[in-house]
Amino acid sequence: MMNKLFYLGLILTLFSFMPQKKNKVIFFGDSITEAGTKPDGYINRIDSMCRLENKSGEFEFIGAGISGNKVYDLYLRLDIDVLARNPDVVVIYIGVNDVWHKVSSGTGTDADKFEIFYSAILKKVKEKNIKTVLCTPAVIGEKTDFSNQQDGDMNKYSNIIRRIALKNNLPLVDLRKAFLNYNMKTNTDNKESGILTNDGVHLNAKGNQLVAEEMWKVIKSL
């Protein structure tokens, strides 16, 4: 009897020293996500927050962003860049180029097609039982008087993502709302950029910090 208890105790002790399986989180997006893996990027900031809360043993963070990507591009590389890696969580942060490129190069994505491809991505992810976090695109221009050229489309595409999140009962990181609220409080000179972005789109240090804070709140609650 004593021998059995000894061996049971030994086994339990050995199990306690085995490394815990980490939750693999993939951030799937465009150049903003690609830059997120840089030292000052939002993905690295999330990793730092995770460590500060003594949760580094629980999560592994992976960036899968490619500059210029739109929702169609994400759909095309979903299998290789996300599903093949067997993540526990995927954070989808897309939409800026779908709107921005309508004006800059005429290669944006119409709203109906945006919703179709976004939903197709979610269908494939859901089939793999991967937890999914949706994010609205933040800004194309930071003016607070609603005079940014593409404010209307940014609101429209953000509403599409909000509706998809609600329909599928998925967690939402509403970066559009968070950025607008931050700019309304701090951008008193109605600047087009320089508050949360370097150029009206790509994040500066404060923008990366805000994105990290908003995403981390949701990720750690899953």
Model-inferred region functions:
Residues 15-67, 72, 77-86:
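Serine-esterase "nucleophile elbow" of acetyl-processing enzymes
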Residues 99-112, 145-149:
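Surface-exposed cleft-lining segments at the edges of enzyme active sites
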Residues 83-92, 96:
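Proline-aspartate-enriched helix->loop->beta-strand connector
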Residues 93-97, 122-156:
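Active-site segments of SGNH/GDSL-like serine hydrolases
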Residues 31-35, 66-71, 96-101, 138-142, ...:
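Solvent-exposed loop/turn segments at secondary-structure junctions
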